[in-house]
Each structure stands twice: as C-alpha cells, then as structure tokens.
From Swiss-Prot:
This is Dermonecrotic toxin LsaSicTox-alphaIB1aiv. Keywords: Cytolysis, Dermonecrotic toxin, Disulfide bond, Hemolysis, Lipid degradation, Lipid metabolism, Lyase, Magnesium, Metal-binding, Secreted, Toxin. Expressed by the venom gland. One of its GO terms (cellular component) is extracellular region. One of its GO terms (biological process) is killing of cells of another organism. Its cofactor is Mg(2+). Coiled coil: none annotated. Pfam families: GDPD_2 (PF13653). The active site is at H5, H41 (nucleophile). CDD domains: GDPD_like_SMaseD_PLD. It is found in: Secreted. One of its GO terms (molecular function) is metal ion binding.
C-alpha cells in the first residue's frame, strides 16, 4: 500500500492518487464536544509540505465517497484504503467513546450513504493514545445500534503513538479487537528514525500468536529509506511522494516480492515474510 500522507483537501485526493497512491491518510480534528470537525493538520507538519489545507470533515467525506464509488465521475479504482489520523489529543480521555460514536455517525451518513452504495474503501481508524481505546468501542456499538454492523468488515485499527508493542496489545484486548490491526511506526520526515520497532512489529505479524496483521512505516520520501523499509518487510509505506515509492517498487529487486495492492487484496489478512 502506497499511502499518500496528509491528504486533507478534496483536490489532493486526485493529486496523490495520480502520483501512484492507492491509499491516503487524512487528519481529523475534533471540536470540544468530540465531534469530528475538520480534515486539518496544522503547523508544524512535514518538511516541504503546506500544513494548513483543510475541509469540513463531512464535506471531505462527500468528496472521498465520490472518489471511491464505482460509476461516479470522480471514481478512482485504485484508491482502496483510507487511514483517518484521529487527532484525539485535544479531547479528555473520557470523551473517546463519544468521539467514536460521532465519527461512526458521520461516516455512516456521509461516506457509507447509510449502507446504500456508499464509498467502498477500507478504513483504518488511527488513534494516537492507547487510553482512547474506547473510541473503537463507541464506533462499533454505534454501527450496531444504527443497524449496519456489517460495515465493521471494512474497518481496521491502528495505535500510532509508537508505544511498546506489548502495551498496544493490551489496549486492543480492552477494546475487544481481535483482528483488522495495522501497526504504524514512524516519525516526521524532518527527523530520522531507525527501523528497530518496525522490525519488532514485523516479527509480531509473522509470529504464530501476534496481534498485528499489517505494518506500515511513515513518513518516507527518499529512495534509500524506501528500500530499507521494504527490506524490513513492511506492508505499507506512507509518503509525501507516492511516485518515489512506486519507482522503487518497480526496481528488479522488489518486483518479485511486492506489488501494489488492489481492492481484491484484503487489508486485514496477514501476509508473512
């Protein structure tokens, strides 16, 4: 999965997919009542990027729905996965459940079209704080209450705080999550980060009793660091330059082992090294 980083304006969906992304990451900020409000990152952000592009969250979902609904004039067949980077740092811990509830209602209405031929992309809810695991509970219980529990088949999870792998496992246990787990590792492109924790995550994925289904690394903009991440066995790379990742994937060293995921590739299925 080539994951376009910080895609927060509708116009950027086309831009990143046209550069080779089959997945995008979108920042979601919340108001003080835990309503998802804007797709917005803010300053500071990655080096070389404009930090302030934004839409209202529900407006963005409308654009995203069009981009992932077959038959729509804006449809991109290859856009198959969306990571919502949920900026829950502005919330109190006890608001996490409400944030999950409100997020589910927004997606149900504006993305899934109440379950009637909505957008088809798989969704990863990426949460920065292990203490906010109840966001997952709120999300799940709301879709059940709204009589669309089947949509959870399209939803996966990530805790993005670079926490100890064992602590992440405990948070999933509390949330009752037993699959659909993406594990991120990384740092802003302005700084360097080694691959030690990525290798631990890959080892967990490849073990017989691990909780991780997929591992992705962020934010990778250079050919050398792309090769290092692929050599470590990641499933996804988040980038500001999808064309760079696509170029490296077409090198003879990688074409035998990797290909770009399509809609038929189940993002919750573990593919071991």
């Amino acid at each position: 999965w080539i994951m376009g980083h910080m895609v927060n304006a509708i116009a950027q969906i086309d831009e990143f997919v046209n550069l080779g992304a089959n997945s995008i990451e979108t920042d979601v900020s919340f108001d003080k009542n835990a309503n998802p409000e804007y797709t917005y990152h803010g300053i500071p952000c990655d080096c070389g990027r404009t930090c302030t592009k934004w839409e209202y969250f529900n407006t963005f979902l409308g654009g995203l729905r069009k981009a992932t609904t077959p038959g729509d004039s804006k449809y991109h067949e290859k856009l198959v996965l969306v990571v919502f980077d949920l900026k829950t740092g502005s919330l109190y811990d006890n608001q996490a459940y409400d944030a999950g509830t409100k997020l589910a209602k927004s997606l149900l209405q504006n993305y899934w079209n109440k379950g009637n031929k909505g957008g088809r992309a798989y969704i990863v809810l990426s949460i920065p704080n292990l203490d906010h695991y109840k966001l997952i509970t709120g999300f799940k219980e709301t879709l059940t209450k709204e009589e669309h529990p089947e949509l959870m088949d399209k939803v996966g999870y990530d805790f993005s705080g670079n926490d100890d792998i064992g602590d992440v496992a405990k948070a999933y246990k509390k949330a009752g999550v037993t699959g659909h787990v993406w594990q991120s590792d990384g740092i802003t492109n302005c700084l360097l980060r080694g691959l030690d924790r990525v290798r631990k995550a890959v080892a967990n994925r490849d073990s017989s009793n691990g909780y991780i289904n997929k591992v992705y690394y962020w934010t990778v903009d250079k050919r050398a660091s792309t090769r290092d991440a692929l050599d470590a066995g990641v499933d996804g790379i988040m980038t500001n330059y999808p064309d760079v990742i696509a170029d490296v994937l077409s090198e003879s060293a990688y074409t035998a082992k990797f290909r770009i995921a399509t809609y038929d590739d189940n993002p919750w299925e573990t593919f071991k090294n």
